[in-house]
Structures are given as C-alpha cells and as structure tokens.
C-alpha cells in the first residue's frame, strides 16, 4: 500500500509538471497566434488606403512622366533643335561660306595683275569673311609681285642708255601704282561692309537662338513646378492615410471593450480570452486528475 501511495504521489507530481509545461506551451502559442492575427488584420485593414495612395502615387508618376515627355521634348524640339538649326546651321553655312569666300578672294587676288579692272568689279561680289585680312594681304602681295614682274620685264626689254624709252616705264609705274592704290581702296572699302554684314548676321542668329532658349525654359518651368506638387500631394495623402487608419481601429476596439461587450473587442482580445479559457480548462483537468489519484491512493 505504501508503494502504491508513493507511486501515485510521484505520478501526480509528474502529471502536474507535464500539464504546467503543456499549459505554458499552449498559452505561449495562443498568445503568439493572437498577436500575429491582430497584426495581420491591422495590415489587411490598412491595405485599401495604401492602395489608394499607391494609385495617387502612380498618378504623380504619370504626371512626372508627362512632364519629362513634354518638357524634355519641348527642350529637344525648340531648344536643341533651334540650336541645331540656327546655331550649327549658321556655323555650317558661314563656315563653308568663309572657306569659299576666302578661296574666291585668293583667286581674284592672283588675277589682279592681269585685269585689275575686272578683278575690281569681281571683288564686291565675292563673299568676304572673317579671314579678310589674309585675303587682302594676298591681294596686295599678288599685285606687288605682278607689278614687280612687269617692271623687271620692262627694264630688261628697254636699254639702259635710252632715257626716252624709260619715261613710258615711269608712266606705267605711276599708272600701276595708281591702279594698285585704287584697287586697295576698293578692296578695303568693300571688305568692312561685307565683314560687318557677315559678322552681324551670325551674331544675330545665336541671339535669336538664345531668345528661343529662354522661352523653352519658361514653358518648361511651370510644368516642372507642377510635378513636385503632385508628388507632394501623393505623399501627403499617404501619410494621413497611414496615420488615420490605425488609431481609429484602436480607438474603436478600446471603446467596445470599455463598454463591456467582450464579443466586439476584436480578434486580439478574443484570442487571448480563448487562450486564458484553455489554460483554465487545463488547470481544472489537473485538479480533477489529482483528486482522482489521491482518492485511489487513499482508498486502495
């Protein structure tokens, strides 16, 4: 009998300890499940406003995309296009014209010795450029070399002792000098006019391009200013949505729990109540089993 009593007492303690362990495990699992379920429900309730905010954010993105499309397109069309059309085109036209003009002036300079009158007539029609200083120097060098060649030829053909024949050479020198002076004056009078016209025209075109560029910037500025406002409103709505969702749920649950309606306290409280009920049931089973063991040990 003593052995049975001791065994029953040992069994009772083992059973109690086992139930306590199981109770702690179940209570911990139920508390964790309740906490996880409350978090999930709060996340599910907060998903619709976050989706709406995501939609408004997409609207802000489309607005920014529209700004990028129209603004950058306007810049590419009006700004860069104007620069390519007027700036680069003017440079290409004036640059190519400069090379052609300088070549034409070099050709007329080379032919000045043969036909000064015809070359003087050609000189206004030739396009003058920024390289007019080199062309005038070429013209003067060509005229001087041609005059020196003629004088040298005349000096060789005419004998030295005949003073009468040398007088026409002096007259020829004077006429050639006069023609050279006139030609230089004509080239100098023609060069600044065309140079001023050509130098003014390319500067006017970049000014027009610069004037067109600020207009593109002005058209670009209001759109770019409107895009951050859309983004700001999207973020503003998102912040208010995230703030307003959770406190309302907590306040409602607190009000319902303070009123005494335990059924409406929410998922977290109901699950916690269930876990506490299960723990109390386990305690009741332990007590019943203990009494039964003691009764059998005592009466047997």
Swiss-Prot record:
Gene Ontology biological process terms, A to Z: cell adhesion
Main subcellular location: membrane
Record Pfam families: MSA_2
Sequence repeat locations: 51-58, 61-68, 69-76, 77-84, 85-92, 93-100, 103-110
Gene Ontology CC: plasma membrane; side of membrane
UniProt keywords, alphabetically: Cell membrane, Disulfide bond, Glycoprotein, GPI-anchor, Lipoprotein, Malaria, Membrane, Merozoite, Repeat, Signal
Membrane topology of the entry: Lipid-anchor; GPI-anchor
Propeptide residue interval(s): 275-300
Localisation: Cell membrane
Intrachain disulfide bonds: 257-265
Functional summary from the UniProt entry: May play a role in the merozoite attachment to the erythrocyte.
Free-text comment on this protein's domains from its UniProt entry: The N-terminal region appears to be involved in lipid binding.
Protein name from the UniProt record: Merozoite surface protein 2
Gene source species: Plasmodium falciparum (isolate imr143)
């Amino acid at each position: 009998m003593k052995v049975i009593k001791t065994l029953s007492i040992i069994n009772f303690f083992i059973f109690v300890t086992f139930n306590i362990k199981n109770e702690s495990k179940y209570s911990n699992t139920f508390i964790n499940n309740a906490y996880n379920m409350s978090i999930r429900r709060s996340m599910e309730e907060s998903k619709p406003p976050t989706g709406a905010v995501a939609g408004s954010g997409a609207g802000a993105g489309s607005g920014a995309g529209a700004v990028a499309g129209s603004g950058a397109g306007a810049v590419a069309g009006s700004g860069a296009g104007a620069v390519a059309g007027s700036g680069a085109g003017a440079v290409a036209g004036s640059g190519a014209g400069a090379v052609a003009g300088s070549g034409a002036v070099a050709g007329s300079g080379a032919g000045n010795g043969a036909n000064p009158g015809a070359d003087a007539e050609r000189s206004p029609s030739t396009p003058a450029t920024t390289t007019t200083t080199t062309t005038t120097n070429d013209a003067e060098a060509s005229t001087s070399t041609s005059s020196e060649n003629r004088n040298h030829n005349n000096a060789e053909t005419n004998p030295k002792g005949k003073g009468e024949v040398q007088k026409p050479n002096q007259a020829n020198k004077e006429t050639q000098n006069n023609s050279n002076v006139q030609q230089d004056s004509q080239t100098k009078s023609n060069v600044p006019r065309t140079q001023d016209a050509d130098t003014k025209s390319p500067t006017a075109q970049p000014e027009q391009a610069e004037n067109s560029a600020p207009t593109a910037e002005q058209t670009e500025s209001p759109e770019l200013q409107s895009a951050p406002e859309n983004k700001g409103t999207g973020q503003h709505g998102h912040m208010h949505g995230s703030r307003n969702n959770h406190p309302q749920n907590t306040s409602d649950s607190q009000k319902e729990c303070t009123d005494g309606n335990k059924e409406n306290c929410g998922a977290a409280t109901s699950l916690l109540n269930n876990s506490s009920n299960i723990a109390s049931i386990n305690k009741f089973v332990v007590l019943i089993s203990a009494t039964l063991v003691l009764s059998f040990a005592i009466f047997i």
